[in-house]
Amino acid sequence: MSKNKDQRTAKTLERTWDTLNHLLFISSCLYKLNLKSVAQITLSILAMIISTSLIIAAIIFIASANHRVTSTTTIIQDATNQIKNTTPTYLTQNPQLGISPSNPSEITSLITTILDPTTPGVKLTLQSTTVRIKNTTTTQAQPNKSTTKQRQNKPPSKPNNDFHFEVFNFVPCSICSNNPTCWAICKRIPNKKPGKRTTTKPTKKPTLKTTKKDPKPQTTKSEEVPTTKLTEEPTINTTKTNIITTPLTSNTARNPELTSQMETFHSTSSEGNPSPSQVSITSEYPPQPSSPPNTPR
């Protein structure tokens, strides 16, 4: 009955609140118009009354809300008192829990486990309950623990018959019967057993960084060999001539041609030393004057 009364009062308060708001709006609009002084005074009085009634309605509304809160707290307290006053009988009757009826003071708390079937894992929630035995109450609050089992994602199992569905990019030799061109093109298929395929990854060779150095030209200084220049000595050309000795007679003095022939036979050496025959000849006869050389003009 108390709940119904609270609901009715709340509805009436809401209705009065709305009507008072509308009246305030209408009175403010009328006050803005140029009316007589008496009408303006009455409108202002109405506005004051409406505003005070709104304040009163708000106070009542807040009080009713507080009353609702207190009523819910009293209901909760009544429920807890009923739980405290009534002791559970199945605790003393269940031998699996290890509790005998002779010592009921050992009963302190009841832990219930609730399994949630909607979640993939299992959630264990520990709830604390209070039990009153011989005017003694003990409470144990334990945090709620949630444990979830992680699903192991298994890889999809591959069928073992993959070997039978291989697509060949070449002509197998089993097809060729007596065709020579087919035997020239075909390739023999090795006998493979279905199993694990081993894939060999190409190993990358380490790149060796080589720095090329410019070869410097090796300059070898050629040792100068001291060369000794041989002083050329003048070669003396000695021409041996058959000297025909002719007796100097009186005819030689008479004939000057004979004297010239004699001078040619007795030739001098390269050093210009006259022969003794020439000296003797020239000594006997005076030298003839030689003709002067032809000088160009």
Curated annotation (Swiss-Prot):
InterPro entries: G_prot
Extracellular-side segments: 67-297
GO CC annotation, single: extracellular region
Cystines in this chain: C173-C186, C176-C182
Ranges of the Cytoplasmic topological domain: 1-37
Keywords, in A-Z order: Disulfide bond, Glycoprotein, Host cell membrane, Host membrane, Host-virus interaction, Membrane, Secreted, Transmembrane, Transmembrane helix, Viral attachment to host cell, Viral immunoevasion, Virion, Virus entry into host cell
Compositionally biased intervals (Pro residues): 286-297
Signal sequence region: none
Composition bias, Low complexity: 233-249
Biased composition (Basic residues): 191-207
Residues at the site labelled Cleavage: A65, N66
Membership in a protein family: Belongs to the pneumoviruses glycoprotein G family.
Name the UniProt record assigns to this protein: Major surface glycoprotein G
Organism: Human respiratory syncytial virus A (strain rsb642)
